[in-house]
Amino acid sequence: YAIPSRIVGSEMCIRDRKKSDYWEATLEDGVRLLAKLPALGAGVYRMRFNKGDRINPDVNKDWAGNFVHMIGLPDKDGNFHRLMQLYLMLHCDHEGGNVSAFASHTVASALSDPYYSVSAGLNGLAGPLHGLANQECLKFVLSVKDKFGGVPNEEDLKQYCWSRLESGRVIPGYGHAVLRCADPRFSAFIKFGQQ
């Protein structure tokens, strides 16, 4: 919800700015937004899972390290921090071919505020054929675990999956809407896990 006086104030500032200088305000907004994301994400996690009060950032930690710190999960060996560095880097690299990146780029191309651009991308990410697919995959894995009372053996899992496919349902999280080969992000996560 935008306060009218701020909207008018922002417009007054932008009117005195040459179009060739818009990048300065955009850069400033972008840096501010990126700086706030770890605290925002960690705060949502802590609120959603009743983990207590907000944890303040640590100025001695990097972007991923602060996210891990503010979530509040133990990370004595630093593996969670390294995993989050990898995860965030791999998911920040989107050229514009998917829904969230395309929506963000489209809104930004109208010289909209970076906050609106990121919001557009997040709204696209919420769809079942994009980011929500990750949640559907996790639900599927947890439902398999519940059905079998733990991790099923290979044969039971194979029968369960074939039964699901033969009934016309999909197995969430497998395959990619665009790629026709292994997702390189998946390969990077497997390599990290094996180390």
Per-segment meaning from a language model:
Residues 142-148:
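Cytochrome P450
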Residues 40-43, 93, 124, 128, ...:
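Amphipathic alpha-helical interaction surfaces
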Residues 48-54, 79-81, 95-102, 132-135, ...:
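Flexible, glycine/charged-enriched surface loops at secondary-structure junctions
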Residues 15-95, 105-106:
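Glycine-rich, mobile lid/loop segments that gate access to catalytic sites or pores
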Residues 148-193:
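A structural-propensity feature for long, helix-poor, extended segments
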Residues 1-14:
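Single conserved hydrophobic/aromatic residue that forms the stacking wall/gate
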Residues 69-75, 85-90, 100-111, 119-125, ...:
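Active-site-adjacent structural elements in folded domains
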Residues 36, 97-99, 109-141, 170-184:
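Conserved phosphate/anionic-ligand binding catalytic regions in large, soluble enzymes, centered on
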